[in-house]
A protein has these predicted regions:
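N-terminal beta-strand motif that seeds the catalytic metal site of vicinal oxygen chelate
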Residues: 1-17, 47, 61-64, 122-130
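Short coil/loop residues immediately preceding or within conserved phosphate-binding loops
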Residues: 7, 35, 106
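Helix N-cap motif at beta-to-alpha junctions
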Residues: 14-15, 68-72
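Amphipathic alpha-helical segments
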Residues: 16-29
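Short glycine/proline-centered loop/turn elements that form peptide/ligand docking sites
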Residues: 17, 35-38
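Short amphipathic alpha-helices within nucleic acid-binding modules
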Residues: 21, 71-77
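Short secondary-structure junctions
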Residues: 27-32, 85-87
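Vicinal oxygen chelate
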Residues: 66, 75-130
Length: 130
């Protein structure tokens, strides 16, 4: 098998809300695709597809991880835009008051899109590749 490229996809229950969130809130380039899909361009030249699903159930796992130079700056910017970080305390993952997990691996914070899908911002660290 020869693989030419890859992309990921996830469902949403409101395409217009997803377009506003990924385009305006996160600042990504979002284009209307076929069949009501959204093509979301991500840094590095790739894209992900968000598609409408009438019986959408939010993903309980992280569907997108955005690598950022500073977790604190990213969380501050998202908070200013009205995005709330998730609070977790299970196994080795415990977030601080700002919603950032700093104990294991690179610092990471999770939040949800309007459809309830889990997304993260994760800080780059020397010697660690995501």
């Amino acid at each position: 098998m020869k693989v030419l490229n890859t992309f990921s996809s996830f469902s949403v229950d409101d395409v217009a809300a997803a377009k506003r969130f990924y385009g305006e809130t996160l600042g990504l380039d979002v284009k209307d695709g076929p069949m009501g899909f959204l093509e979301i361009e991500v840094p590095g030249g790739g894209h992900v597809t968000a598609y409408p699903k009438p019986n959408h159930e939010p993903a309980t796992f992280t569907v997108l991880n955005f690598i950022v130079p500073s977790i604190d700056d990213a969380v501050d910017e998202l908070n200013r835009k009205g995005v709330t970080m998730e609070q977790y305390d299970f196994g080795p993952i415990k977030t601080d008051a700002r919603g950032i997990a700093r104990d294991e691996g690179p610092p990471i914070a999770w939040f949800k899109d309007p459809a309830g899908n889990v997304i993260s911002v994760i800080e780059t660290m020397a010697g660690y590749t995501a």
